[in-house]
From Swiss-Prot:
<feature type="coiled-coil region">
    <location>
        <begin position="554"/>
        <end position="608"/>
    </location>
</feature>
<feature type="modified residue" description="Phosphoserine">
    <location>
        <position position="536"/>
    </location>
</feature>
<feature type="compositionally biased region" description="Basic and acidic residues">
    <location>
        <begin position="28"/>
        <end position="45"/>
    </location>
</feature>
<dbReference type="GO" id="GO:1905515">
    <property type="term" value="P:non-motile cilium assembly"/>
</dbReference>
<comment type="function">
    <text>Required for primary cilia formation and promotes the localization of the ciliopathy protein BBS4 to both centriolar satellites and cilia.</text>
</comment>
<feature type="region of interest" description="Disordered">
    <location>
        <begin position="607"/>
        <end position="645"/>
    </location>
</feature>
<protein>
    <recommendedName>
        <fullName>Coiled-coil domain-containing protein 13</fullName>
    </recommendedName>
</protein>
<feature type="compositionally biased region" description="Polar residues">
    <location>
        <begin position="625"/>
        <end position="637"/>
    </location>
</feature>
<dbReference type="GO" id="GO:0034451">
    <property type="term" value="C:centriolar satellite"/>
</dbReference>
<dbReference type="GO" id="GO:0005813">
    <property type="term" value="C:centrosome"/>
</dbReference>
<feature type="region of interest" description="Disordered">
    <location>
        <begin position="20"/>
        <end position="65"/>
    </location>
</feature>
<keyword id="KW-0963">Cytoplasm</keyword>
<comment type="subunit">
    <text>Interacts with PCM1, CEP290 and PCNT.</text>
</comment>
<keyword id="KW-0206">Cytoskeleton</keyword>
<dbReference type="GO" id="GO:0042995">
    <property type="term" value="C:cell projection"/>
</dbReference>
<dbReference type="GO" id="GO:0031122">
    <property type="term" value="P:cytoplasmic microtubule organization"/>
</dbReference>
<feature type="coiled-coil region">
    <location>
        <begin position="134"/>
        <end position="458"/>
    </location>
</feature>
């Protein structure tokens, strides 16, 4: 604003100086007018004296045309001076307009430099914020282009005004030449003085300054000629076509500016032929009239030698009067033409004045617009600084979020690898267990076959008298089978199922720990914009982008929290599964050891059949103690207590067989329980994978909903 005020003050001072120069010029012109009038009067007096001496009649006839000529010359001089004044005013206005245009060009260049600096400053930004900054810069560049277009329009108008000034100067020069020619016909000594005055006017410093300006404008026009060569070629082609129709050496602008309708070559030829015929008729009439007058004069004055001096003077006076009348008629026609031209020039000057007023008003509006643009640019700079700070903060937040996402991805990758490895291990364990179960089933079948063979052998060795003992053994055998102590294997299975249920409760906890993104409380925005910038549309756009980034951040946090919870659940499951696998491996080792012991004991029984009968007799005595031992037997107790070789050797064969059958049944049940546990573990892992996919789907849905809300808010 200070620069605008200083420029306005300088323009005012320059305008005052120009006005003073114009006043001085007017004073000089008035003095020159007075000198010219005095010189004209003195010349008229000098011419009147010999005429009075010659004859009184000649004074009367000669005074009238001199007064008419002087009046016409004064009128023409006044009009010329008026035109010169108008030219000076237009030149001054053009000078002011040039200065204003230069100032606007300087301001536009300054704004362009600022915009380029802002562009270089914003090239480092990326993402959505960079796109918004780029759109802002594009809008500012569009505004600058509009201003440049307006300034170019003003420049073209000024150039048109300068061209018009040149045309007016040419017309003035032609008018001066006409006046000099007329003055030469009327008075011999007058033209040199007028030409000297015109030369003095042309040699003034203001005229030189105008000529320098004209030279500068011509140089500028020469720079633009290179750009107009293509247009000139097209114009040449059009001019060739017009020359075929209109004729050569004809200005197209005159044809366009002519008020009448345009006529072709054939029509012009017809019109010119009619005009030639009319002029020939007029010439014939004029010749006949001149011949008639000459014959009358000859008839009245047959011989000029016989005429007296007075008659000769009268004839001479009449001829002079005729010549003067013809000259006056010509001058009157020329005066009418000049008056018409002056009226046209006045109209054009009025149009130029109105146009200059419009240009001045437009320049004022441009000044106001430039002031508003400067203020807006300052506000935009402040806004851009604030937005840049927010962008930096958001970039830092995004960087931290990206690091967290990378960490979560790495952890997920490790988890996937662990899960895959665990699945492979579990599959391998299942295959091993299946193979072991098949082996055990084969061994059980072999043992059953051997037991059947032993029973048959035992029954053959026994006699009929030993049937009572057999009857006593059979209820013991049935009692041993129906003993409730042997039904503790389902309890162990129930314990195992309880453990599996606890592991499944962990999976249920895994489900409950995950919260939906819609029920999650929205986090407060860490960086809020200042309220003074909340009304602008640019700030609304930035707020929309910030809200989008917040939505991304919230979704990432939800996903991170849920993944951490899922990781903790999976770690717990892995620990539990590892503990279970260790327990199952330990149990398998114990069962293998037991099977080896049983196989050894069976081989001893085969080798010692006599000892078996003795031990069978002692079976009723140990009948009450056996159920207690069987009641105490369970999968967990077998892990803590193993029967010694001495105890197994003391037990009779039938009880040993019953105990072996019960143990085999227990082992089969345990194998089935292990199979069920492995199947439940696999199902739990499948559910965990499904839950993980559901988590990802929920996070995606939350993110899409946030994006849709942002889009609807923008619209």
């Amino acid at each position: 604003m200070a620069a605008d005020e200083s420029s306005q003050n300088t323009l005012r001072l320059q305008f005052k100086a120009m006005q003073e120069m114009q006043h001085k010029r007017l004073q000089k012109q008035m003095e020159k007018k007075r000198e010219k009038e005095l010189s004209l009067k003195s010349r008229a007096d000098d011419q009147e004296e010999p005429l009075e001496v010659s004859d009184g009649l000649s004074l009367l006839h000669a005074g009238e045309p001199n007064s008419k000529n002087s009046f016409e010359k004064r009128v023409l001089e006044d009009e010329i001076e008026h035109l010169r004044n108008e030219l000076r005013e237009t030149v001054d206005e053009n000078g002011r307009l040039y200065k204003l245009l230069k100032e606007r060009d300087f301001e536009i260049k300054h704004l362009k430099k600022k915009i380029e600096e802002d562009r270089f400053a914003f090239t480092g930004t990326a993402g959505v914020a960079g796109d918004v900054v780029a759109t802002k810069i594009v809008e500012l560049s569009k505004k600058n282009r509009l201003l440049m277009a307006e300034s170019e329009g003003a420049k073209t108008r000024v150039k048109q005004l300068t061209n018009r000034i040149q045309e007016l100067e040419r017309e003035l020069q032609t008018a001066l030449t006409r006046l000099s020619a007329k003055g030469a016909t009327d008075a011999g000594a007058k033209p040199p003085r007028a030409q000297m005055g015109d030369r003095a006017l042309l040699e003034t410093p203001e005229v030189k300054a105008l000529q320098d300006r004209l030279v500068a404008t011509n140089l500028k026009m020469s720079d633009l000629r290179n750009q107009i060569q293509s247009v000139k070629q097209e114009l040449r082609m059009a001019q060739k076509v017009l020359a075929r129709e209109v004729g050569e050496d004809i200005n197209v602008q005159q044809l366009l500016s002519s008020p009448g309708t345009w006529r072709g070559r054939a029509q012009q030829i017809l019109v010119l032929q009619s005009k030639v015929q009319e002029l020939e008729k007029q010439l014939g009439q004029a010749r006949s009239q001149s011949a008639g007058t000459a014959s009358d004069e000859l008839s009245v004055y047959p011989d000029p030698r016989k005429l007296s001096a007075q008659e000769k003077n009268l004839l001479r006076i009449r001829s002079l009067e005729r010549e003067k009348q013809e000259g006056l008629e010509k001058l009157a026609s020329e005066r009418d033409v000049l008056q018409r031209e002056l009226e046209e020039l006045k109209k054009k000057f009025e149009g130029m004045r109105s146009r200059n007023k419009l240009l001045s008003s437009e320049m004022k509006t441009l000044k106001s617009q430039m002031g508003t643009l400067v203020e807006k640019g300052r506000h935009d700079d402040e806004l851009i600084d604030a937005l840049m700070d927010q962008l930096k903060q958001l970039q830092e937040i995004l960087g931290s979020l990206s690091l967290q996402e990378e960490k979560t991805r790495v952890s997920q990758h490790h988890l996937d690898q662990q899960l895959n490895s665990e699945a492979q291990r579990s599959n391998s364990l299942v295959a091993q267990l299946q193979a072991m179960v098949a082996e055990r089933e084969a061994k059980v079948r072999q043992l059953e076959m051997e037991i059947g063979q032993l029973n048959v052998h035992y029954l053959r060795n026994k006699g009929v008298g030993e049937g009572s003992s057999g009857r006593e053994v059979s209820p013991a055998y049935t009692q041993f089978l129906e003993d409730p102590g042997l039904t503790k294997s389902p309890a162990s299975a129930g314990d195992h199922v309880g453990r599996l249920g606890s592991s499944r409760s962990v999976t249920s906890l895994g489900h409950t720990l995950v919260e939906s993104a819609l029920t999650r409380p929205s986090l407060p925005s860490p960086h809020r914009t200042s309220p003074r910038f909340s009304d602008s549309p640019e700030q609304k756009g930035w707020q929309a982008q910030v809200s989008e980034i917040k939505a991304l951040w919230q979704a990432a946090e939800v996903e991170r929290d849920r993944l951490t919870e899922f990781v903790t659940v999976l770690q717990k499951r892995v620990e539990e599964s590892n503990s279970k696998l260790l327990e199952s491996e330990r149990k398998l080792q114990e069962e293998r050891h037991r099977t080896v012991v049983l196989e050894q004991h069976l081989e001893k029984i085969r080798l010692e059949p006599g000892k078996a009968s003795a031990s069978q007799r002692a079976a009723p005595r140990t009948k009450t103690g056996l159920p207690t031992s069987n009641n105490r037997h369970n999968p967990t107790g077998s892990e803590k207590k193993d029967p010694s070789f001495a105890q197994l050797s003391d037990v009779p064969v039938e009880s040993q067989m019953e105990e072996l059958t019960t143990r085999l049944a227990i082992q089969v049940e345990e194998n089935e329980m292990l199979k069920a546990a492995l199947g439940s573990a696999l199902r739990g892992k499948e559910e965990d994978f499904r839950m993980y996919h559901e988590i990802l789907g929920q996070v995606k849905s939350v993110f899409l909903q946030a994006l849709r809300q942002q889009k609807t808010g923008k619209q």
